[in-house]
Amino acid sequence: MLFFSYFSFRDYYLTKLLLLILLCEMILPISAGLVFKEDFENIGELEDNWEIQGVNWKLSSKYNRSPNGYNSLRLAPTQLGVWQQMWQTVNYSKPFHLRIWFYERGWGNRVKVDQQYLFIGDNKTFDSSKKKCQIGQSGHKDYEGFYVIFDGLNARKSQSISDRERWVSFEFVIDDDGTAMIKIDDSVEITLVEKWETVGSIGLGVFGRKDRGGTTDAYWDHLEIFDTVGIPNLALERKNCLTTTWSKLRMN
């Protein structure tokens, strides 16, 4: 009886140790390379991280994309005909990978703004940046059913289509040699002409208009920044057993 109890006790703790090792093996690839995460769940953190410039914002429970999350960021203009935005001044070098999620409601419910965009610049402000890009949605008829990508001042229609309700990922990637690319829905849309060395500013902005149909607000969620080119997909699986650990991870 004592012999049996000894081995049962030993096997119990060996099993726990093996499970712990397996969990660590699974978690490390997820967290490796993550340097910033904004899941738009905490008002205090959001106000600390972002400079708000006139835009109407709130944390909304209408949609959510973050693991174990409840809210997303709702942005809307407070007046028409002016840019309103929220910004972060940052200092990241290549390699760099940013991913954020935009809630697509279909073209019939498109945003009623000239531009509702993610902005990225290589200097402390977007206006002072020599290299800049934008990814987002426009109510302009020329972009009906698609997204809009700006490489500097040059606009182009996306290959990805805005055809149905879903979360869409917008990504900006700089690889080890400075080659920069924009991805939508995990597909490369464009490789930028100029090489990028750094990212100095990121922002989300709106420009309201009254001459286009659609809705006035837009929803964003789960911004991640990595100092690696390749990033994990596992972190966004809501039902994964690791989401609790992932949702608590925050690195500045």
Indicate where each model-derived feature is located.
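Extracellular carbohydrate-recognition regions
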Residues: 31-54, 238-247
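Flexible glycan-contacting loops in extracellular carbohydrate-active proteins
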Residues: 192-221
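Secretory/extracellular carbohydrate-interaction modules
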Residues: 75-144
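Extracellular beta-strand elements of beta-rich domains used
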Residues: 40, 221-225
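N-terminal secretory signal peptides that target proteins for export/translocation
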Residues: 1-15
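Extracellular glycan-recognition surfaces and repeat-rich motifs
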Residues: 44-75, 80, 127
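Short, aromatic/His-centered strand-loop micro-motif at the edge of beta-sheets
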Residues: 148-169
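Localized edge beta-strand/strand-to-loop motifs within extracellular or lumenal beta-rich domains
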Residues: 166-181
